[in-house]
From Swiss-Prot:
The keyword RNA-binding applies. Belongs to the Hfq family. Pfam families: Hfq (PF17209). HAMAP family: Hfq. Homohexamer. One of its GO terms (cellular component) is cytosol. InterPro entries: Hfq, LSM_dom_sf, Sm. This is RNA-binding protein Hfq. It comes from the Bacteria. It comes from Leptothrix cholodnii (strain ATCC 51168 / LMG 8142 / SP-6). Disulfide bonds: none annotated. One of its GO terms (biological process) is regulation of DNA-templated transcription.
Length: 80
């Protein structure tokens, strides 16, 4: 994954993690997972609900916060 992709991805996922925002993660096969982001790295997201699941990023289509979040893409890019 290029560094450019992580300029948006990392700050967004980190905001969701730090603020304990519930998320719905849709996989490329259509499956919907729900929980809180516990951790993430370049390749995986740890999603916690009743159990912790390791979800590979290449399998993720969409991450949808369960409530509004104050995230500005331009600020995330400017800070890096």
């Amino acid at each position: 994954m290029s560094n450019k992709g992580q300029l948006l991805q990392d700050p967004f996922l980190n905001l969701l993690r730090k603020e304990h925002v519930p998320v719905s993660i849709y996989l490329v096969n259509g499956i919907k997972l729900q929980g809180h982001i516990e951790s993430f790295d370049q390749y995986v997201v740890l999603l916690r609900n009743t159990v912790t699941q390791m979800v590979y990023k290449h399998a993720i289509s969409t991450v949808v916060p369960g409530r509004p979040v104050n995230f500005h893409a331009t600020e995330a890019q400017d800070s890096n």
